[in-house]
Amino acid sequence: MESVCRGNSTVGSNPTLSANHITTPNVGGLLGGTMYWLFKEEPSSYSFEEFIKDGQTSWTGVKNPLAQKHLRSVKKGDRVFYYHTGNEKAVVGIARAIGSAYLDPADASGKRHTVDIVPSRKLRRPVTLAEIKADRKFAAFPLVRISRLSVMPVSVKEWAAIEFLSKT
């Protein structure tokens, strides 16, 4: 796992994701609209429950070049699935980017980016990697194809399917 430090300050309200955010085709970023992402974290390092308690965090410590490329693309208002790695291997919550990615001030190289996110809500039930792999709709999903990647895009269809699975 490549992520490091999480959890810093608190933010007042934590809006929830509404259904109308997943009804558009997967061109949101190209048209300046909402994009969808999945961020991975080891729950023993920084669980979604800790994130909720903190109210906000900066997503730091991402070293992989492709994950950094994705992180640099995150914009204010984008939605993020929070994924627990390790023994859990499941999407457990939803967060929202409160600003666009920016250079990580703690990175001595001056090349790595970070983004500030706030929790929106915990999923009704976690959606496991095994469930995702078992569903052919997710064949092209980076979580299935490039499993070690810690920051990845999520298509609108994948987002909607995971949301649906979390409610069943």
Annotated model-derived regions:
Residues 22-32:
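N-terminal, intrinsically disordered charge-dense segments
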Residues 30-76, 166-168:
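Compositionally biased, charged N-terminal/linker segments
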Residues 33-43, 104-168:
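Contiguous surface segments at macromolecular interaction interfaces
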Residues 81-82, 96:
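Hydrophobic beta-strand signal
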Residues 83-89:
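Short, charged beta-turn/beta-strand-edge "cap" motif at the junction between a beta-strand
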Residues 90-100:
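Short beta-strand-centered aromatic/proline hotspots
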